[in-house]
């Protein structure tokens, strides 16, 4: 059966950014708006391994998790019709970063450290990197270290104080501008 081709600015979009910026929620809605499939990389890894992300960190360590992420990215960049929501640290890997930047538009989502903390605390057990005495300071430190890499994304959108629909609308507009600039 032939796939119905509809006008869309991209057939593979990656969402990156720090934990708690809204990549998963926004990714689902963006995929719906663009009529693409949605994959949350963390959930994908959990399904493949049968182990939750916190348990992977706890029992196998961060290094093992990063290897799993890299392998999953390598596999998924070969897919089409996909919005891929990365884990907060996935884009830090140079190999994954290069593959994703070359595959299609990468959208970096941003939020303030305070917003990130508030959102992350809604699911405290799911955020292994924040199991520290001062999580806000940890967020600031990690965000400062990761920001130069997130800035390599093609498109940047703030999620602070905004509804998901608003953010998705802005991303779609910027994806069309990005496609036009590239002559697609």
UniProtKB/Swiss-Prot annotation:
CDD domains, per database record: SK
Cofactor(s) essential for the protein: Mg(2+)
GO molecular function, one term: ATP binding
Gene encoding the protein: aroK
Binding site for Mg(2+): 24
PROSITE patterns: SHIKIMATE_KINASE
InterPro entries per UniProt: P-loop_NTPase, Shikimate/glucono_kinase, Shikimate_kinase/TSH1, Shikimate_kinase_CS
Coiled-coil intervals: none
Catalysed transformations (reactions): shikimate + ATP = 3-phosphoshikimate + ADP + H(+)
Pathway assignment: Metabolic intermediate biosynthesis; chorismate biosynthesis; chorismate from D-erythrose 4-phosphate and phosphoenolpyruvate: step 5/7
Protein's recorded name: Shikimate kinase
Subunit text: Monomer.
Entry's localization field: Cytoplasm
EC number: 2.7.1.71
Annotated residues for binding of substrate: 42, 66, 88, 146
Keyword Magnesium: yes
Residues the record lists as binding ATP: 20-25, 127, 162
Domain of life, source organism: Bacteria
A cellular component annotation (GO) from this entry: cytosol
Note on how the cofactor is bound: Binds 1 Mg(2+) ion per subunit.
